[in-house]
Curated annotation (Swiss-Prot):
This is Ras-related protein Rab-2-B. Protein transport. Probably involved in vesicular traffic. NCBIfam families: small_GTP. It is found in: Endoplasmic reticulum membrane; Golgi apparatus membrane. Its main location: endoplasmic reticulum. GO terms for biological process: protein transport; vesicle-mediated transport. PROSITE patterns: RAB. InterPro entries: P-loop_NTPase (IPR027417), Rab_GTPases_membrane_traffic (IPR050209), Small_GTP-bd (IPR005225), Small_GTPase (IPR001806). The gene is RAB2B.
Amino acid sequence: MSYAYLFKYIIIGDTGVGKSCLLLQFTDKRFQPVHDLTIGVEFGARMITIDNKPIKLQIWDTAGQESFRSITRSYYRGAAGALLVYDITRRETFNHLASWLEDARQHANANMTIMLVGNKCDLSHRRAVSYEEGEQFAKEHGLIFMEASAKTAQNVEEAFVKTAGAIYKKIQDGVFDVSNESYGIKVGYAIPGQSGGAGSSSSQGGGCCS
């Protein structure tokens, strides 16, 4: 399917926060409760529509283990957007956000759009991080913020699409040189009048989540 733009995303965060589950829910609209841990990097893609234009999202799901951080860092380059994910039931995953963000700021392009996602909001009875804390962290660091549930699909679509909307606005505002693919944006060849639809393409699972 033709697209007006292709945006490259990376999903980052600690092991077990649900990165792979978020990707699978977005691309395949299903939840897989038991996964093998992601080894290195896995990939998914899906078409969405923004401003009546078909946009292809190419999403790289990364391993959260420290031993894979060097591999993950290489994927920051050439990413237009990132989902930085923590688990609202595990305080330590929130505490590690600053380290992930430092990595992103150091290795990614300065205009990369970052969406902070507090995953597993379906387990709010086990909450260890308040909504306000997530919101405050995002505000302090210039991130977009949303709580989501890969299990129930709450806000999963919105997290990916809102990130794409912010990237698209930056293109409209002339922030990106779209001829430079190192920004994680590729100009496509959209067929006039064709809508992007919400059809999904291939994705592979991985990671561990509730």
